Curated annotation (Swiss-Prot):
The gene is lipB. Pathway: Protein modification; protein lipoylation via endogenous pathway; protein N(6)-(lipoyl)lysine from octanoyl-[acyl-carrier-protein]: step 1/2. This is Octanoyltransferase. The keyword Cytoplasm applies. It comes from Solibacter usitatus (strain Ellin6076). Belongs to the LipB family. Its EC number is 2.3.1.181. The record marks 140 as: Lowers pKa of active site Cys.
Amino acid sequence: MRNCCLRQLGRIDYASALEIQEQLAASRKQGTAADHLLLLEHPHVITLGRNGHLENLLAGDDILERAGIAFFPTNRGGDVTYHGPGQLVGYPILDLRDWKRDVGAYVRALEQAIIDTLGDYGIEAGRIPKLTGVWVGERKIAAIGVHLSRWVTSHGFALNVSTDLSYFQYIVPCGLTKPVTSMAALGVRASLDEVGERFTRHFARIFDFEMLPGASLAAA
């Protein structure tokens, strides 16, 4: 069993969280840091993946500014997505050489951890063939977009817990016309801390981690 450091960052702006990811990823590549799982919540922000299309952003700068939504192009996979209050965001910084050198298996493992977490609340979630993310019927409840460099991961997932879904009106989520949903919209009331704790348990089981709290850990 390997060690993974859990860092709960609370509500943090996208740029600051990205800086933390980049610092940890650089240290992980150098072998001076352990694997990490960052759990957090963002203020309103729309991000565009490296393969994204601007036409899936349905609002101009003036509209986004009035709505209080920041915009960031990123190097993660996927298209356009929204992050905001009430959404559990997870950024694993992992060296997949210590697990499986298979990005597809990694994404499926993240999806499974989310599916199992939702199952704890009686929500029957699953996958849609050839699409990334976690779905309840035809509605997306969690988005996944990752980045790998020398087999070290960054970026990750966003699970709609009590997200205000009206903010998705400004985008075509992940470039798909399918609707979105949240745990709250499905009648489940839960705090981000509680959902994060349950996710962490499933994440640790699937990746065979012992989760250790703290700001930073040397590589095990």
